[in-house]
Regions:
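Helix-rich effector regions associated with P-loop NTPase G domains
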Residues: 3, 15, 33, 39-56, ...
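SH3/SH3-like beta-barrel fold
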Residues: 17-21, 29, 50
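Conserved Switch II/interswitch segment of TRAFAC-class P-loop GTPases
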Residues: 55-71, 81-98, 114, 121-125
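Charged, amphipathic alpha-helical linker segments immediately N-terminal to NTP-binding catalytic cores
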Residues: 96-144, 282-285, 289
Length: 296
């Protein structure tokens, strides 16, 4: 008789789903045909019930997908508590336009975000705060780490504790090194999971979850570069720049785009140094992109 267990999908590739069962390890599973018939696709992050088919080989079938807390469009994952976006403080110089895109994608999907600046050992404290203050003033938590010097790791672990965190960032920022710092070597199960799902052989093309400790997971997600959010209208973009809200009532025109109109409270705040000019320039570029998307 098949034995049923509950676990979490930590990776899905080529129709196989790797399910982490706490205390038992990783089971390689296939989804039952009923999901396909109902047009339901299991997602990385799903909590599932599996029927164990072969205990020795650790094979099973996914019998049930438990109710989802949430499901993101991009990346296509489920049951995320928060997101962590990692950028290098230097080498490479942070691309703030890319950072803003990620923040908007997560805000749109109602996922709280923490910003992590890695390689903080390459800059002075004053240099770090010059750009991190911009985001802290917008309400985003910011943490500083150095994977090379093992700095800030405990503070980062505190933010991750007990949560499922989607981790993203452009290449070259030390994301893999930082993820390795978060996995204590004494946890043999984590090492076994890495071997089972062949972690580290490829760049991140598929989302996968890495257990850090009990009830604490990080989800390594593929890179991001475009603002591809179905349903986001250019007129709504300013809502995702929280620092605009205070000055929007000062605009002369209702529905002001904060770009070409005269007597715009947001533009006046930029000129007065109350809103970051860098953030405002990113806003204008993203607004134009959304405008162009509508043409096609």
């Amino acid at each position: 008789m098949d034995k049923n267990m509950q676990g979490k999908i930590v990776k899905g590739i080529f129709g196989f789903y790797y399910v982490h069962v706490a205390g038992s390890g990783i089971y390689e599973c296939k989804a039952k045909g009923i999901f396909r018939n109902q047009k339901i696709k299991p997602l990385v992050g799903d909590n599932v019930t599996i029927a164990v088919l072969d205990e020795e080989q650790m094979l099973g079938n996914i019998e049930e997908i438990l109710p989802r807390e949430n499901a993101l469009i991009r990346p296509a994952v489920a049951n995320i508590d928060q997101a962590l976006v990692i950028f290098a403080a230097a080498k490479p110089k942070p691309n703030f336009n890319l950072l803003d895109r990620f923040l908007i994608m997560m805000e749109y999907q109602k996922v709280p975000v923490t910003i992590c600046f890695n390689k903080c050992d390459l800059l002075t404290g004053e240099e770090l705060h010059a750009f991190s203050d911009v985001y802290e003033q917008c309400g985003y938590p910011v943490v500083y780490t150095s994977a090379r010097e093992q700095r800030g790791i405990d503070a980062l672990l505190e933010r991750l504790d007990g949560k499922v965190t989607s981790v993203a960032g452009p290449s070259g920022v030390g994301k893999s090194s930082l993820i390795n710092c978060l996995q204590p070597e004494r946890q043999m199960e984590t090492g076994a999971i890495s071997r089972k799902i062949e972690r580290g052989r490829h760049t991140t093309r598929h989302s996968e979850i890495i257990p850090i400790k009990e009830q604490t997971y990080i989800m390594d997600t593929p890179g991001f570069s475009t603002l591809d959010i179905p349903g986001l209208e250019k007129e709504d973009l300013w809502w995702y720049y929280p620092e605009f809200e205070e000055y929007e009532p000062n605009c002369r025109f209702k529905g002001c785009s904060h770009i070409g109109e005269p007597s715009c409270g947001v533009k006046e705040a930029v000129e007065a140094g109350k809103i970051s000019r860098l953030r405002y320039e990113n806003y204008m570029q993203l607004y134009q992109e959304l405008k162009e998307q509508k043409k096609y």
